[in-house]
Amino acid sequence: MKKLIVSGCSFTDKNFKSMSSPDYDCSFPKWPELLAKKLDMECINLGASGAGNNYIYSTLLEEIIRTPKNEIGLILASWSQVNREDYQVREKNYGRTFAFQDKFDNNMIWKNERIGRQGDVFYWIKDLLRYYISFESLCKKHNLPYKQFQMLNPFEGYLNGLSKTDFEIVNNLDNSNFEKRYKYQPKTKDDRLECFKLPIEYEKFIDTENFIGWPAIWSLGGYAIEEKTLMTDKRHNSVFYGDKRHNIKELIISDYDYHPNAKGHQKISEFIYERL
């Protein structure tokens, strides 16, 4: 049986647990497992809650170089938000939240942060575009079937003021001084326009036929998987403008936790399957 190798963030994590609804049963199969069943493949799900794109790329690379190439049926990169930072330390994982054991090195763990990444949004986007190209080059070097896509919008949420976590929001419902979002400080006259220019500039270096939803930006005619599966079409230029996300409630865990529930994961798996 061939292997389906996938990495991503909490929307992919097979062990996902809701931080704001801890009693919610999240033991249902996630979209990679559902997709693997459709493809009659063994699922190698490397997804981790809170993961950024360094983790996603690095775990895919490590899995690819250590797996006999004739055993690989398909590789999927499910990219996340650009503001996230991933790093490794030589340390044991004692069950801490957002710390994940390195699959191939028991002395190392992965950690991640949502805020405080070095650089700015323009660098982060260029960094992501380089991951797109590097992942594609790695797969083509070994003649491996692959697809890549943004599970989440890469930068709109950050430009509009990154939302606090669902855990923080739920635990501050009675706090009138609580700010739901971090404030974004613009660096140009139109940061959004400058961000839009970057994927357009790099497009000639990317095999867009193998990129589901390219260029992954709604205003440029692309999309993130979350937007096309878990949200309605009640949007203007971006689903992330303001607080109006327009989630389909039947497909998410709760009013505060926007992660897909069992039906949401089923829809994501079907959406991706139809585009392979």
Language-model features, listed with the residues they occupy:
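Serine-esterase "nucleophile elbow" of acetyl-processing enzymes
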Residues: 1-57, 61, 66-67
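Alpha-helical cap/lid subdomain in secreted, periplasmic
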Residues: 61-262, 266, 270-276
